[in-house]
Design a protein with these regions (language model features):
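Topogenic and prosegment regions of secretory-pathway hydrolases and membrane enzymes
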Residues: 1-296, 307-310
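C-terminal substrate/ligand-recognition segments
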Residues: 299
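Conserved small/polar residues in nucleotide/adenosyl-binding loops
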Residues: 312-314
Length: 314
C-alpha cells in the first residue's frame, strides 16, 4: 500500500516543474557545508520523542523500516475496556462466533488463530470518540447524504401509500371500518415519524468492535466495524449499515506496535491509520491514532527519508 503511494508521488514529482529543491534550501541554511564537515551527523543512533497530535507511521518518509519505533497514546482517548466472552462454533465449525457485551452484535473470528488459553476478550468504542474532527465532519456529511437518499425513498413510499388509501376511502365494508380507521392512522403516523426523523437526524458514527486474545507469545487485537467498503453516498445507505454481524476474519491481528511495527486503517472510507497496544494482562486495549496532522509534520521534519525525493531532504 505504502509502496504504491510512494510510486505515485515519485512519478508526479519527477514530471512536475514545482521547485521542490527550494522546500529545504541547503545552501542558504549552510546545510551542505555542515554535512561535508560532519558526514556522520545524520541522525544515526538518535531517538526523538514527539509528544503531539500523533504520528502517522504510513506517512511518506516515515514508513521505512525502523523509522517509527513506537507509538503510544498518552491521552487515554483510545482506551477500550475489555470483557471476557464465551465463543461458540457455527454449524460447520468453520467460524467462531462471539457476542459483543455492549452492542450484542455477533463478531466472527477465525478458529485457526493461535489462542492456547481459549480466552477471548471483547470491547466496543465509538469511532467518533477518537477520530480527528476533520474526519468526523467528512464522514458525517457522507453518511447524511446516504441517509437522505434512503430516507427519501421511504418517505415517498409512505406518502404514496397514504394517498392511495385516502383516494379509496369509503370503499371498505361496514364491518371493516374500525380496522380501516386504524390502518389510516398507522399510515399517517408513518409519514409523521419519517418527517420527524429527517428533522432530528444525528450521526452517532461507526461503532468499533475489538477482539483481543493471547497467541501464546503476545497479546493480539483485531479491530473492525468502521464501514470498510467504499460506497457511493448517492446510492443511499448500504445494507451493511444495518447488519448485526461484524466479520473480523480478514482483519490483521496486531500486537503492541513496538514489537512488530504494524499498522492498519480503520476502513477504506476513512483511511485513518491506527496501531494498538494491549495494556496489563489484556484488560485494556489502547487504539492509537491521530487527532491532527501536526505531530506527523514534526516527525517528518525530524526524520523523514525517501530515496526517490532526495532533493527535499536535509
Amino acid at each position: 500500500m505504502a509502496s504504491t503511494r510512494m510510486a505515485h508521488i515519485s512519478t508526479a514529482t519527477s514530471s512536475s516543474s514545482f521547485p521542490i529543491h527550494g522546500l529545504l534550501p541547503k545552501q542558504a541554511t549552510k546545510v551542505e557545508s555542515f554535512r561535508e564537515k560532519f558526514p556522520n551527523y545524520d541522525g544515526r543512533n538518535v531517538r526523538v520523542a514527539v509528544l503531539d497530535t500523533g504520528v502517522d507511521p504510513a506517512a511518506l518518509g516515515l514508513d521505512g523500516p525502523n523509522k517509527v519505533v513506537d507509538i503510544i497514546d498518552c491521552s487515554g482517548a483510545g482506551d477500550v475496556k475489555l470483557q471476557e466472552v464465551a465463543a461458540k462454533f457455527n454449524a460447520d465449525r468453520s467460524t467462531l462466533q462471539l457476542v459483543s457485551p455492549t452492542t450484542k452484535r455477533t463478531l466472527l473470528v477465525d478458529p485457526s488463530w493461535p489462542n492456547p488459553s481459549g480466552v477471548w476478550k471483547v470491547g466496543t468504542k465509538r469511532a467518533y470518540d477518537l477520530w480527528p474532527t476533520s474526519l468526523v465532519e467528512r464522514r458525517t456529511r457522507e453518511r447524511k447524504q446516504a441517509f437522505d437518499v434512503s430516507h427519501s425513498a421511504l418517505f415517498q413510499k409512505a406518502l404514496d401509500d397514504l394517498a392511495t388509501y385516502e383516494a379509496n376511502e369509503g370503499a371498505e365494508k361496514p364491518s371493516d371500518k374500525n380496522a380501516a380507521a386504524q390502518h389510516h392512522e398507522d399510515l399517517k403516523a408513518r409519514v409523521a415519524v419519517l418527517k420527524d426523523l429527517a428533522k432530528n437526524w444525528k450521526d452517532p458514527g461507526p461503532v468499533l468492535e475489538a477482539v483481543v486474545f493471547h497467541d501464546g507469545v503476545n497479546w493480539r487485537a483485531v479491530v473492525g466495524g468502521a464501514e470498510g467498503d467504499v460506497v457511493d453516498p448517492s446510492q443511499g445507505e448500504p445494507a451493511a449499515y444495518r447488519h448485526n454481524v461484524i466479520d473480523l476474519r480478514s482483519k490483521p491481528r496486531m500486537t503492541d506496535y513496538r514489537l512488530e511495527r504494524e499498522w492498519s486503517y480503520f476502513g477504506e472510507m476513512d483511511l485513518l491509520t491506527f496501531s494498538v497496544n494491549i495494556v496489563g494482562d489484556g484488560d485494556v486495549l489502547s487504539i492509537v491514532t491521530l487527532s491532527g496532522t501536526h505531530g506527523t509534520h514534526v516527525a517528518g521534519i525530524i526524520g523523514a527519508k525517501t530515496q526517490d525525493l532526495s532533493l527535499i531532504h536535509i
